From Swiss-Prot:
Annotated localization: Cytoplasm
One example GO MF annotation: ATP binding
Predominant location category: cytoplasm
Gene Ontology terms: cellular component: cytoplasm
Record's keyword annotation contains Acyltransferase: no
Residues covered by region (LID): 122-159
Protein name per UniProt: Adenylate kinase
One annotated GO biological process: AMP salvage
Keyword set includes Transferase: yes
Residue positions binding AMP: 31, 36, 57-59, 85-88, 92, 156, 167
Domain notes: Consists of three domains, a large central CORE domain and two small peripheral domains, NMPbind and LID, which undergo movements during catalysis. The LID domain closes over the site of phosphoryl transfer upon ATP binding. Assembling and dissambling the active center during each catalytic cycle provides an effective means to prevent ATP hydrolysis.
Pfam families: ADK (PF00406), ADK_lid (PF05191)
């Protein structure tokens, strides 16, 4: 079961990825984690990646694809894997296809931008413990205070409105075109494509994913 999750930041992919991993026993492959692990392990690809990153440059698609191939050849990917955050662009999707990396399911999480902004900018974090609240959906007992310690809550830089809007613009420019790319792939019989309404309750989305994935 090889799965790609598509959707803007804040669309709920992370929450459902945890569920899919637990339910189907497949690992989530994050290219960021993979790069860090390869650099730490000092593999040939890791050394190449380190050299590029140390020079302040972006790692090439070719190198990332090579790392993905290396990663999915490991034992824990025998039953499949879950890709989140990759591919981000059509050239990356093409490179994956050229490298013979097949995908069984592509699942798009559809959520309107304004709801995503609402979801993200309302987050409040207790930095020391990692506890996360939301001013509307999961408020602390006392405004802007952690329930357990009473300490102040903060807003992460990534959760500030201007940052969120920039990330959404980037998503629509680069990643949203993958929706039609994978719809065409599904029409050609190369994968199965599903659109999930991410505006619903977590449990409802989870139930739909179980129906899709079996």
């Amino acid at each position: 079961m090889r799965i790609i999750l598509l959707g803007a930041p804040g669309a709920g992919k992370g929450t459902q990825a945890q569920f899919i991993m637990g339910k189907y026993g497949i690992p989530q492959i994050s290219t960021g984690d993979m790069l860090r692990a390869a650099v730490k392990a000092g593999t040939e690809l890791g050394k190449q990646a380190k050299e590029i990153m140390d020079a302040g440059k972006l790692v090439t698609d070719e190198l990332v694809i090579a790392l993905v191939k290396e990663r999915i050849a490991q034992d824990d990917c025998r039953n499949g894997f879950l890709l989140d955050g990759f591919p981000r662009t059509i050239p990356q999707a093409d490179a994956m296809k050229d490298a013979g990396i097949d995908v069984d399911y592509v699942i798009e999480f559809a959520v309107p931008d304004e709801l995503i902004i609402d979801r993200i900018i309302g987050r409040r974090v207790h930095a020391a413990s990692g506890r996360v609240y939301h001013v509307k959906f999961n408020p602390p007992k006392v405004e802007d205070k952690d329930d357990v310690t009473g300490e102040d809550l903060s807003v992460r830089k990534d959760d500030q409105e201007d940052t969120v809007r920039k990330r959404l613009v980037e998503y629509h420019q680069q990643t949203a075109p993958l929706v039609s790319y994978y719809q065409k792939e599904a029409d050609a019989g190369n994968t199965r494509y599903f659109k999930v309404e991410g505006t619903r309750k977590v449990e409802e989305v989870r139930a739909e994913l179980e129906t899709i994935l079996g």
